[in-house]
Amino acid sequence: MDMNTFPASTYCESIVRFLDAIEYHDDNLTHEERVEGLRHVHSKTAQYFTEPLPRSILKGVAPRRIAAVTRTISHFIVYCWSKLPREAQVDVSIYLSIINVLDDEISSEPSTQMTSFWSDLIQGKQPKHPFWVLFNSHLPRLLRHYGSFCAFNIMRCTFDYFEGCWIEQHNFQGYPGADCYPSFLRRLNCLGGAVAGTIFPAAKFDEQKLFAQMSCVMAQIDGPVALMNDLFSFYKEYDQDEANLVSNWCTVDGITMDQALTRLTDDTIHACVRILDILKDKDPDMLATIRGFIHGYATWHICDFRYRLREIYDREDLQESGARFREYFDKAIDVGWVDVEEWTCQVQGFEVEGPAPSGSEVQAYQANAFGFSVDTQRHHNIDYVGSSILGLFEWATRYLRGKLPLGNA
């Protein structure tokens, strides 16, 4: 799709409709709590990648990419798993960082390395694929925080995610009329089960007492996790020729991108409002946890440069919805923005060549986490390491100026 035809006003209406529907108000953390959480989770996550096993397995991965992933995922965990005990946050952060660092490895044809996977698993042998080598080591460390039901869902979702990546590397969008295919693939790779499993630690939630409520959350959580991400990703993925939920809908159902955006917005609102409505008269801590995740998830998307929502904010062709969009954007930045020097630190054994990120450049630096560039002259999926450092600094400077009062610009 041509970015010149992007329906900016319609997209603003969609974001505003969604944030209105959930009554967006992220009161999860104070600024000081965000800073403390980011410092701890980021430093411990980075330290993991200095250990011998990940160093050996990931020796072909650029340190700059690993650094970008640890920053992005640390943000994600602290903002969305805000009520989780700190050490559990660290282990969830490592779990998701492994997934994202190895995303390219999964997306290359894994059939050969997976030939003996199940027999090796059953017989307790070392797996061959690097994804499973690292998880064979880390999963016991993660699962110690959870009861058996949550742990089972974390494991189930980990297998699902790998399968989803395996399918996605073929870039197959489904046949016309295969109306179940888009949602099937999205459920596999959205990590909803891992979110629901990791958000309820055994130290704070009694699985036996809350089993019915947890089961219901497991059934409902894929929608908020997947669809919120798809809604906030709609702009940055608009001109990319890749299979995703929206483009798959267009292929199998024969609808336009505008129609797909309307469906996506309606489905996202339904998924989030429904899960909160179901829990409103249930365990108050469970409701607070899910509400905190949804509102923190919105804040994280707006604060993360990879979603490029500042570009929408700065457009001059927005209609009435543009003002409301900017209000919500500013609200999220005010509560969620943390400058890099407030929380990053050097981790011994984890040195990255080149200039260290400083100030607001951190969010642009994070652009490598999922392989997207924030170079505004080239919107496509390109490697951060090969992109223009000057372009990133210029983009970050424009962003910072955009969020400051006009008198300071």
From Swiss-Prot:
Reported cofactor(s): Mg(2+)
Placement of sequence motif NSE motif: 227-237
Domain of life: Eukaryota
InterPro entries: Isoprenoid_synthase_dom_sf (IPR008949), TRI5_ascomyc (IPR010458), Trichodiene_synth (IPR024652)
UniProt keyword annotation of Repeat present: no
TM regions (residue ranges): none
Biotech use, per record: The fungal sesquiterpenoid aspterric acid (AA) is a submicromolar inhibitor of dihydroxy-acid dehydratase (DHAD) in plants and is effective as an herbicide in spray applications.
Pathway per the UniProt entry: Secondary metabolite biosynthesis; terpenoid biosynthesis
Family statement: Belongs to the trichodiene synthase family.
Notes concerning its domains: The conserved active-site motif D(D/E)XX(D/E) is required for coordinating the divalent metal ions that stabilize the PPI moiety of the substrate.
Annotated protein name in UniProt: Terpene cyclase astA
Species whose genome carries this gene: Aspergillus terreus (strain NIH 2624 / FGSC A1156)
Gene giving rise to this polypeptide: astA
